[in-house]
Amino acid sequence: MSVVIRLARAGTKKRPVYHVVVADSRFPRDGRFIERLGHFNPLLPKDNEARLKLDLDKVKAWVAKGAQPSDRVARFLDAAGVMKREARNNPEKAVPRKERKAAAEAAAKK
């Protein structure tokens, strides 16, 4: 049984609220879960304390048991200082090459 800590959507249409839950990875996103660990309201300002509420003791216990957090939850846990999130590989594909950069500069001078 692969256990994950993830967000389950709640709320109404166009007014989402998410519950931070521990669930089997095979369960539906908004379906059955093992335990609710907190909630997240993305509509509140980022500096508002009520935007994210987590029971950090329960989160630490589930991580110790082997539960894998989703990407978004891992970001929350990194901000809370519970666990360290790995740096992602972001290649610089959008950076123009030297030839294109030189051509763009030449076109700008005309």
Curated annotation (Swiss-Prot):
It holds the Pfam family Ribosomal_S16. Residues 87-110 are annotated as: Disordered. The keyword Ribonucleoprotein applies. InterPro entries: Ribosomal_bS16, Ribosomal_bS16_dom_sf. One of its GO terms (cellular component) is small ribosomal subunit. GO terms for biological process: translation. GO terms for molecular function: structural constituent of ribosome. Belongs to the bacterial ribosomal protein bS16 family. This is Small ribosomal subunit protein bS16. It comes from Rhodopseudomonas palustris (strain BisA53).
